[in-house]
Amino acid sequence: SRKNFKIAEEQNDWFKSDFVDLRKGDAMDLPVEDNSIDVAAQNCLFNIFKSGDLKKAIEEMHRVLKPHGRLVMSDPTCEQEMNDELRNDERLRALCLSGSLSIADYVKALTDAGFGTIEIRARKPYRILDPKNYPTDELIYIESIEVAAIKDPMPADGPCIFTGKAAIYYGDEDYFDDGAGHTLLKNQPLAICDKTAGALQALGRDDIYFSESTFHYDGGGCC
């Protein structure tokens, strides 16, 4: 609130409350102009909204970002099916757990809104829902991921999704050029998006190694 900014101003000589433009708004109707924001951030948005509201909220963030702007996020995800009782548990909703999506569904929600590049920057253990404390017959394992969704144009062949894959060329030449914009220097890992990994693997070469997804992409990749 504005009151908190005033307190910060009193305690820090360098800070001025007018450094911050504080606006009252709604995630599904942001009081912000189109194409005006460089970076937007959210935490646990995916886990408190129902699917229709979530779709609208993501579309709103895509609307306000400038071209190539970034939506930076951290959310719980779950690769297991949750029963309806867990999904509708208000306690779990308050804990930002009941709406946990699989990573594939999470990414799809972002690309459906028009984000052309997705970077999964971290994936970590987060919580367990166990039968003793929750209405479930099995252990439910929940992870936390950190993602940047970038407002790049959507490529004709689909979004560029970086999950931490890399390709390493170890052939006889100094480098390998696939003729599609990807040059692999000999014995040097090149971070690649999942789409490019699939295209290179389809070449059937026996002198390129492909790593599995680390889900810790840190930039410098090629799509």
What are these regions (language model features)?
Residues M28-A40:
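A short acidic, Gly/Pro-enriched loop at the edge of an enzyme's catalytic core
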Residues C44, E60-H62, L110:
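Class I S-adenosylmethionine-dependent transferase superfamily signal
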Residues K55-R70:
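A short glycine-rich, Lys/Arg-flanked "PGG" loop and its adjoining helix->strand segment in the class I
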Residues S98-I120:
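Short alpha-helix
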